[in-house]
Amino acid sequence: MAKEIVRKAKLQFPAGQAKPGPALAGVGINMPEFTKAFNDQTRDRGQEPVPVLITVYKDKSFEFKLFTSPTAYKLTQIAKIKKGSSKANKEKVATITLDQLKEIAEYKLPDLNTNNIDSAMRQIAGTAKQMGIEIEGYAEWLKKGTN
């Protein structure tokens, strides 16, 4: 018989730096056990934020699933900016190439709701547009259709 799920919680911690605290206290798990396991699994991911889904069972056991870093984080990293534009449709803050867009799409593909790289690129491009980041050659790529 499957374990009864009591709660699911989506949280985000810096890679290798999860600490017991208020965010974890509300989840109702063994915090030291989680932080050790999380930090061990994410230590090699540098300073990037790591989203995690924690599933808590009735017997207080838990399991967690790690996800890829947020798209906005990857875009700011590649574009070498601190944050996106507050007026995205009027003020462009950076430009990235189509190859860089594809690189992010390939990285994010396991967590997106598609298996098609072109669809993933369109999703990432939407986030870039909302952040005021232009993509060189994107309009031509769209007109041309899929690669």
Swiss-Prot record:
Lineage: Bacteria, Bacillati, Mycoplasmatota, Mycoplasmoidales, Metamycoplasmataceae
SMART domains cross-referenced by the UniProt entry: RL11
Gene Ontology MF term list: large ribosomal subunit rRNA binding; structural constituent of ribosome
Function in brief: Forms part of the ribosomal stalk which helps the ribosome interact with GTP-bound translation factors.
KW Ribonucleoprotein (keyword) present: yes
Keywords for this protein: Methylation, Ribonucleoprotein, Ribosomal protein, RNA-binding, rRNA-binding
Protein name, entry field: Large ribosomal subunit protein uL11
An annotated GO cellular component: cytosolic large ribosomal subunit
Pfam family, one: Ribosomal_L11_N
Annotated CDD domains: Ribosomal_L11
PTM statement from Swiss-Prot or TrEMBL: One or more lysine residues are methylated.
Originating organism: Metamycoplasma arthritidis (strain 158L3-1) (Mycoplasma arthritidis)
Oligomer status and interactors: Part of the ribosomal stalk of the 50S ribosomal subunit. Interacts with L10 and the large rRNA to form the base of the stalk. L10 forms an elongated spine to which L12 dimers bind in a sequential fashion forming a multimeric L10(L12)X complex.
InterPro entries per UniProt: Ribosomal_uL11, Ribosomal_uL11_bac-typ, Ribosomal_uL11_C, Ribosomal_uL11_C_sf, Ribosomal_uL11_CS, Ribosomal_uL11_N, Ribosomal_uL11_N_sf
A GO BP annotation: translation
Family: Belongs to the universal ribosomal protein uL11 family.
